[in-house]
UniProtKB/Swiss-Prot annotation:
Pfam (any one): Methyltransf_30
Name this polypeptide is given: tRNA 5-methylaminomethyl-2-thiouridine biosynthesis bifunctional protein MnmC
Alphabetically ordered keywords of this record: Cytoplasm, FAD, Flavoprotein, Methyltransferase, Multifunctional enzyme, Oxidoreductase, S-adenosyl-L-methionine, Transferase, tRNA processing
Required co-factors: FAD
Region feature (tRNA (mnm(5)s(2)U34)-methyltransferase): 1-235
Annotated organism of origin: Pseudomonas savastanoi pv. phaseolicola (strain 1448A / Race 6)
Gene designation: mnmC
Catalysed reaction equations from the record: 5-aminomethyl-2-thiouridine(34) in tRNA + S-adenosyl-L-methionine = 5-methylaminomethyl-2-thiouridine(34) in tRNA + S-adenosyl-L-homocysteine + H(+)
Main location: cytoplasm
Annotated region described as FAD-dependent cmnm(5)s(2)U34 oxidoreductase, given as residue ranges: 266-660
Entry GO terms, CC: cytoplasm
The organism's place on the tree of life at top rank: Bacteria
Amino acid sequence: MTITRHARIDWDEQGNPRSRDFSDVYFSTESGLDETRHVFLVQNDLRRRFSELPEDGRLIIGETGFGTGLNFLCAWQLFDECAPAEARLQFVSVEKYPLSRADLQRALALWPELSRFARQLLDQYVAVHEGFQRLAFDDGRVTLTLLIGDALQMLPQLDGQIDAWFLDGFAPAKNPEMWTPELFAELARLSAPSATIGTFTSTGWVRRSLNAAGFKMKRVPGIGHKWEVLRGTFIAWPEDVAHPPAAKPWFARPAPIGGERKALVIGAGLAGCATAQSLAQRGWQVSLLERHAAPAQEASGNPQGVLYLKLSAHGTALSQLILSGFGHTRRLLERLQRGVDWDACGVLQLTFDDKEAQRQKQLADAFPESLLHLLDQPAAEAQSGVALNSGGLFYPEGGWVHPPALCHAQAAHANIRLIAHQQALELRRVDDQWQVWSDEQLIDSAPVVVLAGAADIQKFSQSADLPLKRIRGQITRLPQTQASAALRSVVCAEGYVAPARLGEHTLGASFDFNSTDLTPNLADHLGNLGLLREISEDLTSRLDTADLSPEQLQGRAAFRCTSPDYLPIVGPLADREAFLQAYAALGKDARQVPNIACPWLDGLYVNSGHGSRGLITAPLCGELIAAWVDNEPLPLPRSVAEACHPNRFALRGLIRGGGK
C-alpha cells in the first residue's frame, strides 16, 4: 500500500497557500472566490439547476482536486441559498494529498463569507484517511464523499452517476499525471446523461481530449486573469471506443423503487438504527421494528465498545471497509457527548508475542502515523497510565463508545417511528408491498424492507440461506477505584479494558462458539479477569480484583453475528432458487457471464453480520444500503460493496458445485 500523506504547503506573505508538491497555487490569489463561482458554478448552471430541483430531488457533483474545499463550500453555499428545503446535494471529490486540519483551517480563514459552512466542514474533518471517506452536513442534506488517493486509482473504484463536474486540480503543466485521456474516460464513464463540466484551463489538447471522451466542449470568456475557460456537456460514449464493462448481473443495481417513500427496518441495533437514519435523512418515512422495549438491547447494548481498527497491510476489502467505516463513525461521534457517550482516548494494542510484533511492524510501515504508530514499552506506559510488560501499536483516534447512545441518537430522527415490543416472524409480498407479520398479526407494510436483526434474519424464508453464525460473548464490569482512574487509553491484548465510564470499567470479552445461554456465568468472568492480567498486572491490582467475591462480578452476554468470510452481509436480496437456476452455467464454467437479469426480491435488503466490528462497519453500511435503495453513488469502492454483497455466497456455491 502507498501511504497517503498530507499536502506540503508554503504560505505567501498574504497568507495564501501554495503547494510545494506541484509548485502551484490552490486558488487565484487575486479573485479566488469569483473565479471558483464563474468556472464551476456558472459554467455548470448550478443556480438554475438547484432552484429547479423537485422537493425530494438531488444533484450530484463530482470534482477532481478537493484542495482547500473552496469549490465545495461555494457550491454548498449556493445550494443552501436557492435549493428547495428537502432537496439534497451530494459532492464527490478526489484528493491525492489532503490538507491537514490545521492547514485547512488556516486556508479557509481567508474567506469569512464562507465561515458558516467552513466551520461545519472543519468540525467533520477528522479521521480523513486513505480511501472513501463520507462526511455529512445539515442532517445529511449535504454529503461529501472524499476519495483520498490518486485520481486514476480512485475514480475507477467509484460507482455512481455524476450530474456536474468540477474539473479542477493543479494546472496541466504542473500536474500532467492527472490530466490524461484515462482520466477523461473515467469522467465519461461516471457521467449521467447530459452531465455538464467546467474547468479553468482552456488548453487546446485538454478540450480536444474531452471531446474525444464524449463531451462537447467550448471555450467561453473567463474572469480575472483567466481570459478563457472551458464548459461542456456529456453527449455519449464514443462510438469507436469499447464501452467499459458493466457490473456482472448478480452485482448490478436493482431498479429503483418508485412511488411511496416508506421503509421498514427490522432490528434496532447498530445496523438497524444506522440504516433507519440513513434512509430517514433521504426523506424516507421509516418504521423501525424492535422486539424489545427500546433500541440497543442485544449485542449493541454493552456499556462500552472499542473503536479499534483490525487492519491488513495488504489493502483487503475488509481493511478498506474498516478504514472508511472508522472515519465515518468517528465523525458521527463528534455530535455526541464526549466522556459519557464516547471518548477519543486512543487504543493501544499490546505486542504480546512475536507474531503480533511482526504484524504491527507491517501495519506501521503501511499506514500513516496519524492513524497508528508503534510505541516502545516506556512510551506505552506513559500513554496508558499503567505499568505494562510491552509496547504496542497505538491508534490515537480510537477510543471507546457507549453503543446505546449512538443507536438512540440515530433512531431519534423525525422521520423514524419506533415500533417496540413487536416480533417480526414472516415477510409476505402483496401488491408491490412487503408485509411484516407476527404470528397472524400484520405489523406494518412498505415497498422497502431492510433486515438488520443479526442472525435472527434467518427465520425469514427470503434470507434463511444466508450463512450467519452466532458467537456468544460476555463482558465484565468492574467498579472504578481511585488507583484505576490512572488508565487513560483503551488497552488490548487478547482481551481489552477501557477507561471508566460513569464509574465503571468494561473488560472482555469471551468467545464461545457453542453456548446459546445468555445468562452471565462465573467461568467467563474469571476468563475476562485472566485477560486483564495478561494486559496489565498493575491495573489488575489497581482494580482490587483479588478482593472481589464471585457474586460481585457483574456483566452481560450477547451474541455477535458474523459470516464465514468475516465481512458483513449488506445489499439487495435475490430469490435464491431463481438465482441458482439463472446462473447454473457457472457451475460448469465460472468465467461465463450469462446475460440474465438477477431475480431480485424487489425492495428487500439486508444489513447484518458485523461481528465485533459493528461500531466501525454498521453505520457506513447504513449509508451503503441507502445508496443501493436510492441509486446514489456508493460510499465504498465497488469492489468492497461486491465483497459485502449477499449474492456472494450463492455465487460461490454455484462455482464450487451445486449452489449448496
